[in-house]
Curated annotation (Swiss-Prot):
This protein's name: Elongation factor Ts
A Gene Ontology molecular function term of the record: translation elongation factor activity
UniProt keyword list: Cytoplasm, Elongation factor, Protein biosynthesis
Family statement: Belongs to the EF-Ts family.
Main localization (coarse): cytoplasm
Region (Involved in Mg(2+) ion dislocation from EF-Tu): 81-84
Species name: Thioalkalivibrio sulfidiphilus (strain HL-EbGR7)
Length: 293
């Protein structure tokens, strides 16, 4: 497969590595971008997958809560520009969609779009909004939480771009909000080690083993190094293993233990995460216009 300059450029942006290192990795993986990144991580050539999880789309994350605070719905609605994201009509639509999710409990986005909202379907209302604001509008995803008996729901919004909802077993509203704020800031992958996907753990172990092998140390030392790195990795990605943002001397797990509470589940949305927006090259655009003039 031919390795193009644009492929090398993308890999450089995602890893922070040099041009020749990127070209070599792409050649060795026959142009497979993800495989090249993994290969470079194993060899230590990749500084970080900088592009992964990059926020690119605009819109809002909104939350609706039932009057008795036992049910919550969180929705992400996307548009093309920050200007429209702040538009009153767009904001009203996003909030009404969250209310429909809360009351109607649709199974998925397709079912949601067919539900009634103020005399028309959500899809029809979306189409009307597109005509009004002049931009594409998409209801991307939603989550609905319902507290079990004796449970507590909490939510937190950081501006209009980040939303977190959490369900606690035990605890109170203040603790739930503190946990939500922590999740917003620290981005845990899951609640605890039991929820870490085995595939993800195996992949990280393989990468850590390849990195440790570069040291040339004996196998038993390498195994200890890998175990230590896995332990640190799990503490970084699990909610209960992370240092609590308001008191870094204790973990979230210890905070919950002291309050006699557990986190059943949480949801964290950030506007546009995982969606890549087209990058405009204004120099090329001006050149094209000049040639056409």
């Amino acid at each position: 497969m031919t390795i193009t300059a644009s492929m090398v450029k993308e890999l450089r942006e995602r890893t922070g590595a040099g041009m020749m290192e990127c070209k070599k990795a792409l050649a060795e993986t026959n142009g497979d971008m993800e495989a090249a990144i993994e290969l470079m991580r194993k060899s230590g050539a990749a500084k970080a997958d900088k592009k992964a999880g990059r926020i690119a789309a605009e819109g809002q994350v909104v939350v609706a809560l039932s009057d008795d605070a036992t049910r919550a719905a969180m929705v992400e609605v996307n548009c093309e520009t920050d200007f429209v994201a702040k538009d009153e009509n767009f904001e009203k639509f996003a909030n009404r969609v969250a209310e429909v999710v809360l009351s109607g409990a649709p199974a998925d986005v397709s079912a949601l779009m067919a539900q009634n909202m103020d005399g028309a379907s959500v899809e029809e209302t979306r189409a009307a909004l597109i005509a009004k604001v002049g931009e594409n509008v998409q209801v991307r995803r939603f989550e609905r939480l319902e507290a079990a008996a004796g449970g507590t729901l909490g939510f937190y919004r950081h501006g209009n771009r980040i939303g977190v909802a959490v369900e606690l077993e035990g605890g109170d509203a203040e603790l739930a909000k503190d946990i939500c704020m922590h999740i917003a800031a620290s981005r845990p992958v899951c609640v605890d080690e039991t929820q870490v996907p085995q595939e993800l753990l195996d992949k990280e172990r393989e990468i850590f083993a390849a990195q440790a092998a570069e040291s040339g140390k004996p196998a038993e030392i390498i195994e200890k190094m890998v175990s230590g790195r896995i332990k640190k990795y799990l503490a970084e990605i699990t909610l209960v293993g992370q240092p609590f943002v308001k008191d870094p001397d204790k973990t979230v797990g210890k905070l919950l233990e002291g309050a006699g509470a557990k986190v059943r589940r949480f949801v964290r949305y950030e506007v546009g995460e995982g969606i890549e927006k087209k990058t405009e090259n204004f120099a090329e655009e001006v050149m094209a216009q000049a040639k056409g003039a």
